[in-house]
Amino acid sequence: MQTDIAIAQSAEILPITQIAEKAGLKPNEILPYGYDKAKIKLDPTISRKKDLGKLILVTSINPTPAGEGKSTVTVGLADALALAGKKTMIALREPSLGPVMGMKGGATGGGMSQVIPMADINLHFTGDFHALTAAHDTLAAVVDNSLQQGNPLNIDPRRIIWKRVLDINDRALRHITIGMGGPTSGVPREDGFDITVASELMAILTLSTDLMDLKARVARIVVGYTYDKVPVTVADLGVSGALAVLLKDAIMPNLVQTLAHTPAIIHGGPFANIAQGTNSILATKTALQLADYTVTEGGFGADLGGEKFLDVKVPILGKTPDTIVVVATVRALKHHGGVALADLNNENLTALAAGLENLGQHLKAMGRYGVPVVVAINRFSADTDSEIQAIKDYAQAFGAAAYTTTVWAEGGAGAQDLAAAVIEAADQEADYTPLYQPENEAIDKLNAIVTTIYGGLGVELSATAQKQLMAFKAQGWDKLPIIMAKTQYSFSDDPKRLGAPKDFVIHVREFVPKLGAGFLVAMTGSILTMPGLPKHPAALDIDIDETGKITGLF
């Protein structure tokens, strides 16, 4: 069986100018990055249609080590829609090097349902993440320089909340001391690193509507507090323009293609467990303006990327999904039902029935938004007909039809039934209802997410979090949308509680205000913003030969 990268390397790749033409972009509306990649210029005249196209949101059950193949289904579904004669585009996030070299892998799909050039996209791509890292760390350097140069803003070094970032999983950098080496080496203080995708700049990049909106959002970033506990912003430091300059190319969406030559826009990459987990507003909006159907996805499960797409991205995008597709696999559901990874290839209808409760909670959560929901069963070779039918019957009880897909092996041809169902569902009248209103109190928003989306009892705030909320109310920040930073493996904040637990509360240990992005991050459980490498990182399996051919990259 060929690896994903072997399939990608043997594929015919069309010139990016040809893909742009297929998408409806004129030659002067793109900036080619070589033969097979391009930036799409920020041009308000790109819109070719009076009405935006249909928006299909792909999400999934809680991920497991068994794999769900959400990105693979996303790509395969788009190719299937194209096969059905629909003008289709994909809008995905960019992969982070941390997981690529760590344990999760890339974000370009798999098998015959991939976006290409796969290796380039999973590695440095067009340099967006490097530009973002440089901008973020420039701001960090400016903060420390202000301390060194007499501290004119009266910044309290103990209350600086702007860490440094790196797009690599490196647990040793979570907590560090900087400014050592004497008076000429800066002011000593505690600091740390987050992974680049956790940067507020990444959230801003993906939520900005244009370059000036990005610059205005950057100016609102809070980097820390004075000795009098007054917020210090980028506007106070005077570098919003410089940071916007560093991001002027990164804000432009990236155009590539699938193996079947469906145009794909890949842009932005916030994780859904520590940020909003969606691709950029600009990428999605551009695709909607050009195509009849745009297929996009939310990171991790519907409890994270799905909820954040619907409650954080949709109000800015100004377009609700026309259909939500929830991806599930027999293997993952059996794992949620208690089956060990080594035994997932064996039929086990009892465990599957127990694990189906995880799917059920996601269907209830997505169904409450008033958008038609369809289930995609990503079929593996060991799945039995009885197991597949059990999922279909279960989903039907929630009013959601389920369809098997074999897109890894067959590409778009393996999702034709799913595509037909999505087309039919997208023609239904959606009645989108947000989970909460902007004027709701933060605690009410938190409880709505936990009780309605997660199926839990509510939230419990630490003393620190309670104190922060009181301070935020005084600042007028308490009505901002909520981003839950939570484990992706469970509805609860305990990654070991699989399935669909009910008797749990979510423990919020602290909040992180992200005024530039426009939300409050609720840090729950033991979630981290700088991952570590596993015992056997993926980097150990990646190699390159004398011809430049890469191996081991999935």
UniProtKB/Swiss-Prot annotation:
Disulfide partners: none
InterPro entries noted in UniProt: Formate_THF_ligase, Formate_THF_ligase_CS, P-loop_NTPase
Catalytic activity entry: (6S)-5,6,7,8-tetrahydrofolate + formate + ATP = (6R)-10-formyltetrahydrofolate + ADP + phosphate
Alphabetical UniProt keywords: ATP-binding, Ligase, Nucleotide-binding, One-carbon metabolism
Entry EC number(s): 6.3.4.3
Family stated for the protein in its record: Belongs to the formate--tetrahydrofolate ligase family.
NCBIfam families per the UniProt record, alphabetical: PRK13505.1
UniProt cross-references to Gene3D superfamilies, sorted A to Z: Domain 2, N(10)-formyltetrahydrofolate synthetase, Formyltetrahydrofolate synthetase, domain 3, P-loop containing nucleotide triphosphate hydrolases
Functional pathway: One-carbon metabolism; tetrahydrofolate interconversion
Residue intervals passing through the bilayer: none
Name of this chain's protein: Formate--tetrahydrofolate ligase
Molecular function GO labels: ATP binding; formate-tetrahydrofolate ligase activity
UniProt-listed GO biological process terms: tetrahydrofolate interconversion
Top-level taxon in the UniProt lineage: Bacteria
Residues that bind ATP: T64, P65, A66, G67, E68, G69, K70, S71
Pfam families for this protein: FTHFS
Keyword set includes Membrane: no
Keyword ATP-binding: yes
